[in-house]
């Protein structure tokens, strides 16, 4: 088994080209909110102001930070948590070999060699969720941090959390995480799924995927590991993750019963929840809406039940002919969640896995139950978001958003795409980004990325990059459509740079500067091409923007308005044509 992960084992890159890490200070000492500042060149001697953008990359892009993965990243939130006075350290549960799928203790690797702190939990009778604080009228340090990142007032953040329209996923045992918010009145967020399988990947690879995904803009990470070393892989990811980490606890619980769904018990699952909460998982996908009576509704589907968690619980329900134990024990789950401030991501175990099954009775029956469970969670002041489909054609997407807002009382929606067609394996990052942009516009708060490997295999780091960038495009397009007050600043800056032929600024303002520069340099690699007033698409004679510049220059020289310049130029060209004999070809 693997002993540790070092910075030398994975590729860690500095900040993106033309950018630098900057920090905005909050009201309390030591609160530093990260931003990425993109420096811009002058336009004919007139300075262009730098553009600041949201940054998810954590300390890895700070040139003053020394990466030591075996120690984990800094824990700025720990003091905030302790100062509130409502938590206590305790010994925590014993880490067992079976947590990593190992039978003998002699084969078990130490989980995280330099972990020297005990887990935290709420003191007896206390509730430590951000929703609980918000409902008491308290603006926490986390809420202020989020307000600075989003460019809004802290009171607005508090109110959105208190009313359930947004969540701030921040387990008290994940102090490494930089606070962020998920809600339809904030920037649309992107989640990246990582995790090993029974046949592929290592701890080092998964840690690298995490740092890689956050570099390109992933707002949260889900560790969906189903292979060996589940506990240890998760520990290394969380200790080094600057963003919230989510999981599907039923996957690990299933490993503890040797992969036999019918052998699952509430006791095994409960133990797994506590194990992961003590590690610092920020949100759990829990498929508590897959009820026994809904399973027959999937019988006539084209693709049945495609959710792994949903199919596991359906199999358990049918084998025992009992109601889903996640549903029957939901109040007890809430009691665990509020001790650590773990947020619910209520799973859509009956989501459609094909266009043929979109918006069917099974899907919406489960959604009704998720609405019921949302009310129960809110009774405990536990934060909730709702997971959504799936495979949905464009004309049926809006109905999903409208039903979710109505049935789940406006809780944030978190969707996988949706994929808008089933005919493009290898390109499902595109088929799903179409749906993601639409549903983000309609109100979805977070989009779960899809990589080119969807339906085909486990994604590697290049697939992760492709998936994140594709979904950042969808999320930004949704922000523009919703009229988010700061969304268009970057578009306008890039458009201005494009019109002024500031090529390097164009590259640096893009979501993937390295790819933009690479494509440009394939045909025009010379340094002089970075200042040329054309690209290889049109060349120097047919560049529309160069022609526009020429028209403006002509108008300026002749003291004309642009429209007058065009008319005058047209008349002059017509005169030249007639004087040359009116021949089409000279």
Curated annotation (Swiss-Prot):
Family: Belongs to the ThiC family.
Gene Ontology cellular component annotations, sorted alphabetically: cytosol
Catalytic activity from the UniProt record: 5-amino-1-(5-phospho-beta-D-ribosyl)imidazole + S-adenosyl-L-methionine = 4-amino-2-methyl-5-(phosphooxymethyl)pyrimidine + CO + 5'-deoxyadenosine + formate + L-methionine + 3 H(+)
Gene Ontology biological-process entries: thiamine biosynthetic process; thiamine diphosphate biosynthetic process
Cofactor note: Binds 1 [4Fe-4S] cluster per subunit. The cluster is coordinated with 3 cysteines and an exchangeable S-adenosyl-L-methionine.
Lineage start: Bacteria, Bacillati, Bacillota, Bacilli, Bacillales
GO molecular function annotation: 4 iron, 4 sulfur cluster binding; carbon-carbon lyase activity; zinc ion binding
Record's compositionally biased regions (Basic and acidic residues): 92-102
Alphabetized Gene3D superfamilies for the sequence: 6.10.250.620, Radical SAM ThiC family, central domain
Annotated TM spans: none
Annotated EC: 4.1.99.17
Function: Catalyzes the synthesis of the hydroxymethylpyrimidine phosphate (HMP-P) moiety of thiamine from aminoimidazole ribotide (AIR) in a radical S-adenosyl-L-methionine (SAM)-dependent reaction.
Superkingdom field: Bacteria
Binding annotation for substrate: 193, 222, 251, 287, 307-309, 348-351, 387, 414
Protein name (database record): Phosphomethylpyrimidine synthase
Entry keyword set: 4Fe-4S, Iron, Iron-sulfur, Lyase, Metal-binding, S-adenosyl-L-methionine, Thiamine biosynthesis, Zinc
Statement: the UniProt record of this protein carries the keyword 4Fe-4S: yes
Pfam family, one: ThiC_Rad_SAM
Cofactor(s) demanded: [4Fe-4S] cluster
Keyword hit for Cell inner membrane: no
Family annotation (InterPro entries): ThiC, ThiC-associated_dom, ThiC/Bza_core_dom, ThiC/BzaA/B
Region feature (Disordered): 38-59, 92-114
Pathway: Cofactor biosynthesis; thiamine diphosphate biosynthesis
Binding site for Zn(2+): 391, 455
């Amino acid at each position: 088994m693997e002993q540790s992960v070092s910075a030398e084992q994975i590729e860690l890159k500095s900040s993106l080209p033309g950018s630098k890490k900057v920090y905005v200070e909050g009201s309390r000492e030591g609160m530093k909110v990260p931003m990425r500042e993109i420096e811009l060149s002058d336009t004919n001697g007139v300075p262009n102001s730098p553009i600041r953008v949201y940054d998810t990359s954590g300390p890895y892009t700070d040139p003053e930070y020394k990466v030591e993965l075996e120690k984990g990243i800094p824990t700025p939130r720990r003091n905030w948590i302790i100062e509130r006075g409502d938590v206590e350290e305790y010994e925590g549960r014993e880490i067992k070999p079976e947590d990593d799928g190992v039978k003998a203790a002699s084969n078990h690797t130490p989980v995280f060699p330099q972990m020297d702190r005990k887990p935290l939990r709420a003191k007896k009778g206390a509730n430590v969720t951000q929703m609980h604080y918000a409902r008491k009228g308290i603006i926490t340090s986390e809420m202020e941090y989020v307000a600075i990142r989003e460019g809004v007032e802290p009171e607005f953040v508090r109110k959105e959390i208190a009313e359930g329209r947004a969540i701030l996923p921040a387990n008290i045992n994940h102090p490494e995480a930089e606070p962020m918010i998920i809600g339809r009145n904030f920037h649309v967020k992107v989640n990246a799924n990582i995790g090993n399988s029974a046949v592929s990947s290592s701890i080092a690879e998964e840690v690298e995927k995490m740092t890689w995904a956050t570099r390109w803009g992933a707002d949260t990470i889900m560790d969906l590991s189903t292979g060996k070393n589940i506990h240890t892989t998760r520990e290394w990811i969380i200790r080094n993750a600057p963003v919230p980490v989510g999981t599907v606890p039923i996957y690990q619980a299933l490993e503890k019963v040797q992969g036999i769904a019918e052998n699952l018990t509430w006791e095994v699952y409960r133990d797994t929840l506590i194990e992961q909460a003590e590690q610092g998982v920020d949100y759990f996908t829990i498929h508590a809406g897959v009820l026994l009576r809904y399973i027959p509704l999937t019988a006539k589907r084209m693709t049945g039940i495609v959710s792994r968690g949903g199919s596991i619980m359906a199999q358990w329900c049918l084998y025992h002919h009992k109601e889903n134990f996640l549903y029957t024990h939901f109040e007890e789950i809430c009691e665990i969640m509020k001790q650590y401030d773990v947020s619910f991501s209520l799973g859509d175990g009956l989501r459609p896995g094909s266009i043929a099954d979109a918006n069917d009775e099974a899907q919406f029956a489960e959604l009704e139950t998720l609405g019921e469970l949302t009310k129960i969670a809110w009774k405990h002041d536990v934060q909730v978001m709702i997971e959504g489909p799936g495979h949905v054609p464009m004309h049926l997407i809006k109905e999903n958003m409208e039903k979710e807002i109505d049935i789940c009382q406006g809780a944030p929606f978190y969707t996988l795409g949706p994929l808008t067609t089933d005919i493009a394996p290898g390109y499902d990052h595109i088929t799903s980004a179409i749906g993601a942009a639409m549903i983000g516009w309609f109100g979805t708060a977070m989009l779960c990325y899809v990589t080119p490997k969807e339906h085909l295999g486990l994604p590697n780091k290049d697939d992760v990059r492709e998936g994140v960038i594709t979904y950042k495009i969808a999320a930004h397009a949704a922000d523009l459509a919703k009229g988010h007050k700061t969304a268009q600043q970057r578009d306008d800056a890039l458009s201005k740079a494009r019109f002024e032929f500031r090529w390097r600024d164009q590259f640096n303002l893009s979501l993937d500067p390295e790819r933009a520069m690479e494509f440009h340099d394939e045909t025009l690699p010379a340094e002089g091409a970075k200042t040329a007033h054309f690209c290889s698409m049109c060349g120097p004679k047919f560049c529309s923007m160069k022609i526009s510049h020429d028209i403006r220059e002509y108008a300026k020289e002749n003291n004309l308005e642009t429209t007058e310049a065009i008319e005058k130029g047209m008349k002059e060209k017509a005169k030249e044509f007639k004087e040359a004999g009116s021949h089409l070809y000279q």
